[in-house]
Amino acid sequence: MRLIPLVTAEQVGKWAARHIVNRINAFKPTADRPFVLGLPTGGTPLTAYKALVEMHKAGQVSFKHVVTFNMDEYVGLPKEHPESYHSFMHRNFFDHVDIPAENINLLNGNAPDIDAECRRYEEKIRSYGKIHLFMGGVGNDGHIAFNEPASSLASRTRIKTLTHDTRVANSRFFDGDVDLVPKYALTVGVGTLLDAEEVMILVLGHQKALALQAAVEGNVNHMWTITCLQLHPKAVIVCDEPSTMELKVKTLKYFNELEAENIKGL
């Protein structure tokens, strides 16, 4: 596992965006051989999306031959709702780059048959072989996507009940009213995530410090979903300074020295 310890949220976003752009450009995607990118929502990736849009407008990357799969979507929230993840992605990323509409894949939280929708999503991912890079965030309790504590590490795309803590955390997007936050969501599974060629998780803020500590210094534990990254052959965590407050000094020193060349220029 790689840990990229940075100082600010803006630096985390810029590093993540630069990494994505480098991966896409090195892959040299075509219409017949697209680069497959997994994407998250929420507050954490906003700086990364902003940086990606800026790099696209500067001519440094094209998304014309990129296929995307989003991590999750609320159940029962109309896709036109401003807080649906469909709306979020278009508002913050898709509408500002050259990705074709047919290359965008989002779960349908209003599908008449939820189980069939989850199977369809998994089959669509498999039809491309694999996701080349899956970017994600992490919750205070270590959840990735909506794989809450005690999620199976072999799980696939499915419906999940959101914990009260997750709904409280997300209520900031619903005028602070937890009752407006949906109780259920569709989410890729931990197994789906681990199938990706590379997984990159962004960690911001002191509230995520215990989750980061579990991921880097703890044991694999289904109560901390983020620890699944220890099972992945190519996982990278990009974090800001406040999120590292629970890490041992020697752990942070080790990764700072190891990644010194990769941190330059931010």
Curated annotation (Swiss-Prot):
Pathway annotation from the record? Amino-sugar metabolism; N-acetylneuraminate degradation; D-fructose 6-phosphate from N-acetylneuraminate: step 5/5
Q: Which residues lie in coiled coils?
A: none
Which residues are named in the active-site annotation? D72, D141, H143, E148
Sites annotated Part of the allosteric site: S151, R158, K160, T161, Y254
Q: One biological-process term from Gene Ontology?
A: N-acetylneuraminate catabolic process
Organism's domain of life?
Answer: Bacteria
Q: What broad class of enzyme is this?
A: hydrolase
Catalytic activity annotation = alpha-D-glucosamine 6-phosphate + H2O = beta-D-fructose 6-phosphate + NH4(+)
Q: What is its EC number?
A: 3.5.99.6
GO MF: glucosamine-6-phosphate deaminase activity; identical protein binding
What Gene3D superfamilies does this protein's entry cite? 3.40.50.1360
| Signal peptide positions on this chain | none
Q: Name one GO cellular component term.
A: cytoplasm
**Alphabetized UniProt keyword annotations:** Allosteric enzyme, Carbohydrate metabolism, Hydrolase
- Activity regulation field: Allosterically activated by N-acetylglucosamine 6-phosphate (GlcNAc6P).
Q: Could you tell me which Pfam families the record lists for this protein?
A: Glucosamine_iso
Q: How does it assemble?
A: Homohexamer.
Role: Catalyzes the reversible isomerization-deamination of glucosamine 6-phosphate (GlcN6P) to form fructose 6-phosphate (Fru6P) and ammonium ion.
Record's family? Answer: Belongs to the glucosamine/galactosamine-6-phosphate isomerase family. NagB subfamily.
Q: What is the protein name stated in its UniProt record?
A: Glucosamine-6-phosphate deaminase
Name the gene behind this protein.
Answer: nagB
